[in-house]
């Protein structure tokens, strides 16, 4: 009868609407990631940084995150240098090549005015037994308003 047809019609419409709403959302997410990756490949530092964040936070893939942070850093996105340096420092040990690379990344960002990078340079130097250098970088971070840097400088100067 006609009543059955109407019920099927309504069911079909609901299913169609559901598909129409959810499928493009999944595709849009995929294309946003692809778009970011393409922009990063073209040298867009912000896109590289966002990809680094995505891999660090969402995917929990530090190795891939580091690649994107390094690209962001090379393209002039200083927080990419800082975050990449942090991943390297966490992975490495004093005097390791990871520490050496972290130092380079922190140095670039610190010189550009990123106080967390200066603070982290203080910590790297401290871990490698370079107290005077550690104090210098903690002071630099402190002068930029980094309270942690002020506290560490004060403690080490005693």
Identify the residue ranges that each predicted region occupies.
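Residue-level detector of the short coil/turn that links helix A to helix B
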Residues: 59-60, 97, 129
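Terminal, low-structured helical/coil segments at or just beyond the last alpha-helical repeat
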Residues: 140-158
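Bacterial N-terminal signal peptides
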Residues: 12-21
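Short helix-capping/linker turns of helical repeat alpha-solenoids
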Residues: 41-45, 55-58, 75-78, 91-92, ...
């Amino acid at each position: 009868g006609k009543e059955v047809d109407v019920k099927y019609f309504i069911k079909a419409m609901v299913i169609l609407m559901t598909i129409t709403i959810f499928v493009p959302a999944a595709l849009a997410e995929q294309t946003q990631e692809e778009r970011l990756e393409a922009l990063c490949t073209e040298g867009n530092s912000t896109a590289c940084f966002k990809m680094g964040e995505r891999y660090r936070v969402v995917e929990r893939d530090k190795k891939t995150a580091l690649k994107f942070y390094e690209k962001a850093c090379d393209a002039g996105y200083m927080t990419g240098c800082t975050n990449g340096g942090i991943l390297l420092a966490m992975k490495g040990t004093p005097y390791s090549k990871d520490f050496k690379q972290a130092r380079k990344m922190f140095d670039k960002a610190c010189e550009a005015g990123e106080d967390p990078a200066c603070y982290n340079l203080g910590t790297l130097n401290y871990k490698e037994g370079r107290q005077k250098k550690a104090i210098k970088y903690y002071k630099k971070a402190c002068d930029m308003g980094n309270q942690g840097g002020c506290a560490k400088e004060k403690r080490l100067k005693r």
